[in-house]
UniProtKB/Swiss-Prot annotation:
Gene3D superfamilies: TolB, C-terminal domain. Residues 1-18 form the signal peptide. Exacerbates Leishmania infection in mice when co-injected with parasites and yellow-related salivary protein M10. This is Yellow-related salivary protein M35. One of its GO terms (cellular component) is extracellular region. Salivary gland (at protein level). Keywords: Secreted, Signal. Its main location: secreted. It is found in: Secreted. Probably modulates blood feeding of sand flies on vertebrate species by binding and sequestering different mediators involved in the host response. Functions as a chemoattractant for host neutrophils; likely acts through a G-protein-coupled receptor and effect is dependent on calcium influx and phosphatidylinositol 3-kinases (PI3K) activity. The gene is M35.
């Protein structure tokens, strides 16, 4: 009887935590509009990253060529065209942006404060048999202007040398616009910070100087081995720095950069003032530990609530922490928990204060996971509403 009551209490908690979170879309397989079904395998189209432009109400997805027969590597979905209450699994459209060169394989899109869509083309496909179709090239950062029709490409930078080492190890990246009021002007300064979870390094790109460099630190390394459990089997992962999120700007335009390793429960912080100066000695600060089995590969900061959100990989939950409080397990709350959140892979806070998070059921290892139910899920919730019932994350 005690066991039954415990299970019922857990299920009640799941529902309570999940009530305010809206399930927008979910897919078992993804179809692409305008591409003949015979030329692609819909089960191999697995988004790893998502970005939402609140002004156009457009979603953008990174669809890496991790498996064979993936016809496009960036897709879009108009939330105006598909009401999730009517259809949960809409097909995706080909990205309408005008790229000057074909994109090889994109894992994550990011929208910056200037309404530019940045993608990091890793320049290599994971399926060796398809490298004749998609020749390997240098990885590249590419930006598209979302304020103009057809999203023209407005910036491209090829990574070389140490910055291009092990591109399949690129994790999340953050775009730092120092002063959004100067978007598009000659004196605009923008930096991009790219995590590499294999090399345990952070790449810094200076857009104005067209230069990139690599930073190393022990805090970028995995603490040990983390696990992902599926169908009763534990799969081991050992990943270094994976997620990075930027905090509030000060008067000089500098910000805290929060980061975590995929195989760690600790959270660190670096001042972007150091990141932006080539050759600086890093002085990372250990903020604290989130607690047992809280490993995550993605995090997002909400400036309105002063809360960091974490997409935890094996716990199947989204947690939260208010940056005004000490980081310790007692101060970490949970806004969403569901057995259906299979490997949360990306999250973001849009310009209207909504938290978006996605799971795709496919950790970064070779074995492809099998699912009977829809495993690609995209969720949305207003940040203020998300923490309303979670006192630990309130200011």
């Amino acid at each position: 009887m005690k066991l039954i009551l415990t299970v019922l209490a857990f299920l009640s908690l799941q529902v309570a935590l999940s009530d305010d979170v809206g399930r927008l879309y979910e897919w078992s397989k993804i179809d692409i509009v305008g591409v003949r079904p015979s030329v692609y395998d819909s089960s191999n189209i697995i988004p790893t990253g998502v970005a939402y432009d609140a002004d156009s109400k457009m979603l953008f997805f990174g669809l890496p060529r991790k498996y064979s027969k993936v016809p496009i590597t960036v897709a879009q979905l108009s939330t105006r065209s598909y009401n999730s209450a009517e259809r949960r699994d809409p097909p995706l459209d080909k990205f309408s942006g005008k790229s000057k060169k074909p994109l090889t394989s994109v894992y994550q899109p990011v929208i910056d404060d200037c309404r530019r869509l940045w993608v990091l083309d890793v320049g290599i496909v994971e399926v060796k048999a398809e490298r004749k179709t998609y020749p390997t090239k240098n990885p590249a950062l590419v930006a598209f202007d979302l304020t103009k029709p057809d999203y023209p490409e407005i910036h491209r930078y090829e990574l070389t040398g140490d910055a291009a080492k092990t591109p399949l190890g690129y994790g999340g990246f953050a775009v730092d616009v120092v002063n959004p009021k100067k978007c598009g002007k000659n004196d605009e300064k923008t930096y991009v910070y790219i995590a590499n979870f294999v090399e345990n390094s952070l790449i810094v790109y200076d857009k104005k100087k067209s230069d990139a460099w690599v930073l190393k630190d022990d805090s970028f390394k995995p603490e040990g081995v983390s696990t992902y459990t599926h169908n009763g089997k534990e799969h081991e992962l050992k990943t270094g720095i994976f997620g990075i999120a930027l905090g509030d700007r000060n008067k000089e335009g500098n910000r805290p950069a929060y980061y975590l390793a995929g195989s760690s429960t600790k959270l660190y912080r670096l001042d972007t003032k150091l990141l932006k100066k080539k050759g600086s000695k890093l002085v990372p600060k250990l903020i604290g530990d989130r607690g047992y089995k809280t490993e995550a590969i993605a995090l997002a900061y909400d400036p309105e609530t002063k809360v960091l959100f974490f997409a935890e990989t094996d716990s199947r939950q989204v947690s939260c922490w208010n940056i005004k409080k000490e980081l310790k397990p007692e101060n970490v709350g949970v806004i969403y928990s569901s057995a259906k959140l299979n490997f949360a892979t990306d999250m973001m806070v849009d310009s209207k204060g909504f938290l978006w998070f996605m799971s795709n059921g496919q950790p970064p290892f070779d074995e492809k996971m099998k699912y009977e139910d829809p495993h690609i899920r995209l969720m949305k919730v207003k940040t203020k509403k998300a923490i309303k019932g979670e006192k630990r994350c309130q200011g």
